[in-house]
Design a protein with these regions (language model features):
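Binuclear metal-dependent phosphoesterase catalytic core
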Residues: 4-7, 89-92, 108, 115-147
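Core catalytic region of metal-dependent phosphoesterases/phosphodiesterases
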Residues: 1-62
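Active-site environment of divalent metal-dependent phosphoester hydrolases
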Residues: 1-5, 26-30, 48-53, 75-80, ...
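Charged, elongated alpha-helical/coil segments that serve as electrostatic interaction surfaces
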Residues: 79-102, 135, 140
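Active-site-proximal segments of metal-dependent phosphoesterases and phosphodiesterases across multiple
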Residues: 49-91, 121-124
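Active-site neighborhood of phospho(di)ester-bond hydrolases with catalytic His/Asp-centered motifs
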Residues: 18-24, 42-47, 68-71, 94-100, ...
Length: 147
């Protein structure tokens, strides 16, 4: 179910060069990665990825922007994004991505974009969705897209 939704998203977003998985990928992600060799995958483990070898958070640098990405359960994102933003700033990033709550969020505050795509499999606040973040010379545009 989850990998089918992921394939639909990647087929719809063919121009995407980077793909972020924010945890709870539960094992079927390796098959998806093999199907899209032209994309760069950035993956972190979530609270349901007990045997995962992926880190709980990581950093990517894309087009001059630092992207801190995590599932978020270790940073208490269910209770607010302050610790997430603090960790992203400490890492020199201007974009923070997280999951865990399965509730979408797009926020810009004090030079930091904070984005939660919701979930493509098990949303908690409405429709299944994902996020697209266009990074261009003239700015950053994050949007949530319903499936």
């Amino acid at each position: 179910r989850r990998s089918g939704n992921i394939k639909k998203i990647l087929d719809a977003q063919q121009s995407a060069r980077h793909v972020f998985f924010l945890g709870d990928v539960t094992g079927d992600i390796e098959d998806v990665i093999r199907l899209y060799p032209d994309k760069t995958f950035h993956i972190v483990s979530g609270n349901c990825d007990i045997f995962s070898s992926y880190p709980s958070s990581d950093i990517a640098n894309i087009a001059g922007h630092g992207i801190f990405f995590t599932h978020g359960h270790t940073l208490g994102v269910k209770y607010g994004t302050e610790r997430l933003v603090s960790a992203a700033r400490a890492a020199g990033c201007d974009i923070a991505l997280y999951g865990h709550t399965h509730a979408s969020k797009v926020l810009y505050e004090d030079g930091m974009y904070v984005v939660n795509p919701r979930s493509c499999a098990e949303p908690r606040d409405g429709s299944k969705s994902y996020a697209v973040i266009d990074i261009e010379e003239n700015g950053i545009m994050p949007i949530i897209i319903k499936i």
